[in-house]
A protein has these predicted regions:
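Acidic, low-complexity terminal tails and accessory targeting/binding regions
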Residues: 8-16, 92, 98-112, 151, ...
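Active-site-proximal alpha-helix that buttresses catalytic centers in soluble enzyme cores
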Residues: 16-92
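Active-site-adjacent alpha-helix immediately C-terminal to a catalytic or transition-state-stabilizing loop
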Residues: 27, 77, 140-170
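Phosphate-handling substructures
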Residues: 39, 43-44, 85-141
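A short, well-structured juxtamembrane/interface segment
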Residues: 53-58, 138, 144-145
Length: 170
């Protein structure tokens, strides 16, 4: 689980974003039932992930926050729930804060797409064997989503690694 602070100037504001990666998920039940694609997004946190989320409120960065915004994906939503309960921060759920999109199914294809994404610095080459969301598309999706919160000074955003890394180092 990671935390990182970013000041966004792109929204005509100096909004501070505290990025939080969701806790560790437990995919076992979904894998046993052969779920794929967005079905895997139903995975809850593992015991370790719940513990990570419950301890997160102690991070001093969170003390300056005014709002908690989360991806609608279960592992992020469950992480945000624990933080909201512990801090009393109001919680908003945003479907546009979802995981990076790969337009083909299967874990092997996902890993191949991630490798291509990193090798090509977030660009999608015209001859790419796999179609995926580019870094520019992810940034645009995030900024569009967060524009409605521009009046908040500091916002905690619980989301996913590939989206976070467009704004903070991995």
């Amino acid at each position: 689980m990671a935390c990182g602070l970013v000041v966004l100037g792109q929204l005509d504001t100096k909004m501070k974003i505290i990025f939080v990666r969701h806790g560790e998920p437990d995919y076992r039940e979904l894998e046993e039932r052969s779920y794929t694609g967005f079905g895997m997004d139903l995975a809850p946190l593992s015991e370790k992930g719940r513990q990570q989320a419950q301890e997160l409120w102690q991070n001093p960065l969170l003390q300056s926050a005014n709002l908690l915004v989360t991806s609608a994906v279960t592992r992020a939503l469950e992480t945000a729930f624990y933080v909201s309960c512990a801090t009393g921060l109001p919680l908003r759920v945003e479907p546009l804060l979802h995981e990076w999109q790969v337009y083909e199914s299967g874990i092997d294809r996902f890993e191949e797409a991630r490798t291509l994404f990193l090798e090509n610095k977030g660009e999608l080459l015209s001859n790419s064997p796999i179609q995926y969301e580019t870094a520019t598309e992810m940034k645009s999706r995030f900024l569009e989503c967060m524009a409605k919160y521009r009046d908040y000074q500091t916002v905690v955003v619980v989301t996913h690694r590939m989206l976070m890394r467009q704004f903070v180092p991995d």
